[in-house]
Amino acid sequence: GHFYHGGTGSSVHADQHCLGSGVTTGIDAGSSGFLNYDAMRDYVFPAHQTRLLALLHIGAVGLAANRILGGGLHDMRIIDVDRTAETIKENQGGLLGVKVRMHMDAVAYWNAPIAMKLAREAADKSGGLLMVHVSGTPIPLPQVLDHLKSGDISTHAFNGYTESILDNSGKVRKEVREAVDRGVIMDVGHAGVHCDVEVVKSAMNQGMVPDTISTDIHLAPPGRSVYLMNDLVSKFHALGMSLPDTIRASTWRPAQVLRLQDNLGSLVPGMAGDAAVFDLREGRFVWHDMAGHNVEGKVRLDPFLTVKGGRIVWQEGRLSQMGEC
């Protein structure tokens, strides 16, 4: 998601979107760069109950002007590989790696290969992972995937743009399968326009199931819907994943991918002590995408209680009326 609240036009207040959906830990996906990360770390993140970590944008100021300029990589002078890598190394535990947006509005096709190369260099120098926004890429998807190594993340992987994980015949591209085989993570990164129901169905029918389920929660432009985590888990269950698999893809698996599995993602002794309790509601529920495709399901996870570090940080209204428990 994007949690540099007050620092970018697309960021949200994490507590208002995470805790009430059963989420205790949010990963900011490149809202800040090396020039403004300190402000996000020192003044924004501490004002939240939600545990917040981040990926550092390859551009110096992240998404500070994305709602005005459309993206942060229109001029390659905004990238400084060494300062980006140094910032990540100086903030181990808070910064997990590098984020680069390969979207046609964020970077021109003639600059996209350069931005990918520099993002790869910064990730390697920092020792962190590389997350790439692949939805709407101005260059062929295989060229983007060529830069990704084991443990790196292809987010918005199930988008419906021309350069999606499917080829023109609707088959999963061989380059995508090769990337998965070498350990590249296929992340949902749902957002409002970056997850196409028909692409998900086709990919899953061919054995390409999401590694991780994420919201890319942000302040959406008018006319767009952005789902919270409990709805996404429910939606992907309706799309054919088992409920245990959807839960794993939104808890334990992301913790592994982000190298946080020693503290987060499960309830074994010694972990942070985070948990979420849901009502499993039965009925008729419909989720949609911006292409007009709908998914109908029979169950939905409704948040009831969220616990972080062994302490209740959010509770549904009925529980408040019951008193202390």
Q: What do the predicted segments below correspond to?
A:
Residues G1-A47:
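Metal-associated gating/positioning segment near the N- to mid-region
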Residues G1-S10, I68-D82:
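Active-site mouth loops of central-metabolism enzymes
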Residues A14, A39-M40, T84, A119, ...:
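Aromatic/hydrophobic pocket-lining residues that form π-stacking "cages" and hydrophobic walls in ligand
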Residues Q16, G20-T24, A47-R51, L56-R77, ...:
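Active-site gating loops and adjacent loop-to-helix segments of metal-dependent hydrolytic enzymes
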Residues M102-G223:
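Active-site core of metal-dependent hydrolases
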Residues E198-L280:
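His/Asp/Glu-enriched, well-ordered alpha-helical/loop segment
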Residues A272-E324:
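C-terminal cap of metal-dependent C-N hydrolases
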